[in-house]
From Swiss-Prot:
Its cofactor is [4Fe-4S] cluster. This is Probable dual-specificity RNA methyltransferase RlmN. The keyword Transferase applies. GO terms for cellular component: cytoplasm. The gene is rlmN. Its EC number is 2.1.1.192. Keywords: 4Fe-4S, Cytoplasm, Disulfide bond, Iron, Iron-sulfur, Metal-binding, Methyltransferase, rRNA processing, S-adenosyl-L-methionine, Transferase, tRNA processing. InterPro entries: Aldolase_TIM, Methyltransferase_A, RlmN_N, RNA_MTrfase_RlmN, rRNA_lsu_MTrfase_RlmN/Cfr, rSAM. Reaction proceeds by a ping-pong mechanism involving intermediate methylation of a conserved cysteine residue. It comes from Caldicellulosiruptor saccharolyticus (strain ATCC 43494 / DSM 8903 / Tp8T 6331). Residues 96-326 form the Radical SAM core domain.
Length: 344
């Protein structure tokens, strides 16, 4: 069975090259074709000996994805990507003034069961490999003809539910031989898997941490984010404090504002109270409507009122620029709509 070549770190590929009897520098050349030139056809590896190219073709898959469809709202572009086994994932290309970002998936489906998220529709199918995550970047760079400088692991799936592959993915794209994307330009978003936060605290690369909080108290969060029954807000905040003490990195708390659910002034005051004095940033996200879920975004005036409460409490906060509601840009919507995936 062929292996995906992008599942290999540089050191792993160098070892494979040496085992074939070739010189180690061939690994540098192969990585240059894969990551600097985004080549997906071994026949384009013109400086690689024919015999080694043949060996690569026999043993490896160079591209694990194909684009099924994409939609654009004039700025962001949402991609539906099919894997070799027929499963599908989504990625979003996001152009900003500071550079181009990509929001990638880490799993096919998700088992976190967040109430407002389309990724959970149909349940969890499988983890993505490191190479399947890398291929989201390579394919979208090839299509858009734009270099990606920022990576957010905030698509379908829970990154800390696939932590070993996620760390390997980061090692590959951060390496100078690979994509050479700076660690501080990579963000992991989690619903609050406490074990993962502690592991990230010890991880040698200074990637960013974002917590999908969405509620200021356990009673409400238990309903919106069922994983809260295992990892409470208190557990998450304790882990975040440890992460900050180890890394001195500011943590982002994502808060999806849902009309009539978690957008009251009382909720804003509660949120300000639990985050006060911490090295954090709050990202307010007016929720995208999801088919089959009765959630809608609050009026702009209420979003601004919520924002003002946090600002007056001394908390750093932004309202996320709304991208992609017309293209079903929230996690999992394009996949569930295209394949008519329903709740399990």
């Amino acid at each position: 069975m062929k292996r995906l070549i992008k599942d290999f770190t540089f050191d792993e590929l160098k070892k494979w090259v040496e085992e074939t009897g070739e010189k180690p520098f061939r690994a540098n050349q192969i990585f240059e074709w894969l990551y600097k030139k985004n080549a997906t056809d071994v026949n384009s590896f013109t400086n690689i000996p024919t015999q080694l190219r043949k060996r690569i073709e026999e043993e490896f898959i160079l591209n694990s994805l194909r684009v099924v469809k994409y939609e654009s709202d004039g700025e962001s572009i949402k991609f539906l990507l099919e894997l070799v086994d027929g499963n599908a994932i989504e990625s979003v290309f996001l152009p900003y003034k500071y550079g181009n970002a990509i929001c990638i998936s880490t799993q096919v489906g998700c088992r976190m069961k967040c109430a407002f998220c389309a990724s959970t529709i149909g349940g969890m199918i499988r983890n993505l490999s490191a190479g399947e995550m890398v291929d989201q970047i390579v394919n979208i760079e090839n299509i858009t003809k734009k270099k990606i400088s920022n990576v957010v692991l905030m698509g379908s799936g829970e990154p800390f539910d696939n932590i070993e592959n996620v760390f390997k993915f980061i090692d590959i794209i951060n390496s100078k031989e690979g994509k050479n994307i700076g660690a501080r330009h990579i963000t992991i978003s989690t619903v609050g898997i406490v074990d993962g936060i502690y592991k990230l605290s010890e991880y040698p690369k200074q990637v960013n941490l974002a917590i999908s909080l969405h509620a200021p108290n356990n009673n409400l969060r238990n309903k919106l984010v069922p994983m809260n029954r295992k990892y409470s807000i208190e557990d998450i905040l304790k882990a975040v404090d440890y992460y900050i003490s180890k890394t001195n990195r500011r943590v982002t708390f994502e808060y999806a504002l849902i009309d009539g659910v978690n957008d009251s002034i009382e909720c804003a005051n509660e949120l300000a109270k639990i985050l006060s004095g911490k090295l954090v940033h709050v990202n307010l996200i007016p929720v995208n409507p999801v088919n089959g879920r009765n959630f809608k975004k609050p009026p702009k005036e209420r979003v601004k009122e919520f924002y003002n409460v946090l600002i007056l409490s001394g908390i750093q906060v932004t309202i996320r620029r709304e991208l992609g509601s017309s293209i079903a840009a929230a996690c999992g919507q394009l996949r569930s709509r295209h394949y008519n995936i329903s709740e399990k």
